[in-house]
Swiss-Prot record:
Gene coding for it: mab-21
Name of the molecule in the record: Protein mab-21
Pfam short name (any one): Mab-21_C
Signal peptide location: none
Species name: Anopheles gambiae (African malaria mosquito)
InterPro entries named in the record: Mab-21-like_nuc_Trfase (IPR046903), Mab-21_HhH/H2TH-like (IPR046906), MAB21L/cGLR (IPR024810)
Amino acid sequence: MLVPPEMIAVQSKLIYQMNKYCADRVQTRKAQIHKTIQEVCRVVQDVLKEVEVQEPRFISSLNDYNGRYDGLEVVSPTEFEIIIYLNQMGVLNFVDDGTLPGCAVLKLSDGRKRSMSLWVEFITASGYLSARKIRSRFQTLVAQACDKCSYRDSVKMIADTTEVKLRIRERIIVQITPAFKCAGLWPRSASHWPLPQIPWPHPNIVSEVKTEGFDMLSKECIALQGKNSAMEGDAWVLSFTEAENKLLQGGCRRRCLSILKTLRDRHLDLPGNPVTSYVMKTLLLYECEKHPREMEWDENCMGDRINGIFLQLISCLQCRRCPHYFLPNMDLFKGKSPGALENASKQVWRLTRIMLTNSRCLEEL
């Protein structure tokens, strides 16, 4: 099919605009974040070294692989989460019966094996390994380590939370989250994935993702708040970061994500934080399902994909619901106020309208 010359010209201009935006705004954001990460990891590694001296079961897994750190997630340019992988689930079974959206529990396979667990004192009378008990112990150790470490003048524990959160030089927030890696397992609550009628991702990628497995994090779960569930303190939050990152390889998907995060940081960092980087990442995964062919992720299509994601975002904000990609029963907007979602919807619509009507909009955004 012949494409009219004027369409080719418009497309070329858009590709030029996208490339320029990546070179200017996106790379500047990445460089600033990279610099902050180096500072954050120096401080956290020092704190965790002190923790390990006090309690050898909490071994730091924060290692530098040519400037990349395993288990480090950028929440925003001034907020980070660092996952510390714990050893030996051992005699514990993974239980995911769907009663706790976004969460699961670890239960002793046999009551007689209690003493064989590395984490024996954190196992409840009912045989569950309590995420909250482990986190509480870890929080105490980190608080003591902050007072002893080399950076004690610039790092402080954030009070009034059960999470392990540090404030570095008054401007950077880091959450340190204990976790177990669950390789070779796939949760029942995500068993519907991939959808049979959608030809993405390729079966080989699906197999790799499921073999890689997922993580179980010791952190507060928004989905359980206010339910007074007896299991709430024992439950572990399911995380699919590695799976998500693997799915976003190929084509311009990673590039799209970088542009989305940059636009989010510059224009959608709103009161109540309804539009997180993780929401953008989730909507990008749904866009991959809507456009399963690789040719639809060529750089010529990048503008269409980004506009499509912003239109999805408006729809989610207006419906006040954004389902987790792997766990659709879990709503990423849970706990956000209707006012914050309404305000965000208006802001996103303004931004989308500019992007749809002005081919040179990225010069100003």
